């Protein structure tokens, strides 16, 4: 039987990057329905955010991510890559951004969203 890592509970962390506020959340989610419910909850809680980027990996094979309006490949994929690199399963990560008025550029977005997932 193959072993795999799962989060032991929910987590939250915040940081500021060039005046943009990032809030990272991680959740244990055992089904795709649970992952989508958590995403809905975050979108309702942070309804006024500029972006709610997410990625999830469910052990049964469901893997999804979204840039939520950020330039393609600069937000959801870096979040997913952090989860994959850490070999996590049954996990949903949502990184919320409140735009601070300064454009971060593609590289800055990748670094910021990856940091939010860590």
Predicted segments with their positions:
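C-terminal regulatory domains involved in ligand/effector binding and gene-expression control
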Residues: 1-73
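Conserved interaction-surface patches within small, structured recognition/assembly domains
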Residues: 68-102
